[in-house]
Amino acid sequence: MGNLISTFLSSSKGNSTAQITDCSIWCPRPGQHISIRTFRELNRAPMSNPTSRKTGTVSNGDCSRLTEEVLEADSRHQTTQLPRH
């Protein structure tokens, strides 16, 4: 059986009451293909793509690396300021 993967994300923007919370726990089997898709739309800029997708094949020891990549990409996305028009 593969490693247990647990992720939790909670964020809010400024003085807004909007809050995004995501929590998921799963345990993929070695060799199992997983796809993680996230969608976020808060004051979307024109021509931006709010959907991101991460895919990978799970093997022992690689689960946490894949999860870290997803969380790191999400963290970078949250801290990026969108240009104002």
Curated annotation (Swiss-Prot):
The keyword Aminoacyl-tRNA synthetase does not apply. One of its GO terms (cellular component) is host cell plasma membrane. The keyword Lipoprotein applies. It is found in: Host cell membrane. Residues 44-63 are annotated as: Disordered. Residues 46-62 have a biased composition (Polar residues). It comes from the Viruses. A lipid is attached at residue 2 (N-myristoyl glycine). Keywords: Host cell membrane, Host membrane, Host-virus interaction, Inhibition of host innate immune response by virus, Lipoprotein, Membrane, Myristate, Suppressor of RNA silencing, Viral immunoevasion. Pfam families: Gemini_C4 (PF01492). GO terms for biological process: symbiont-mediated suppression of host innate immune response. Transmembrane segments: none annotated. It is a lipid-anchor. Belongs to the geminiviridae protein AC4/C4 family. Pathogenicity determinant. May act as a suppressor of RNA-mediated gene silencing, also known as post-transcriptional gene silencing (PTGS), a mechanism of plant viral defense that limits the accumulation of viral RNAs. This is Protein AC4. It comes from Potato yellow mosaic virus (isolate Venezuela) (PYMV).
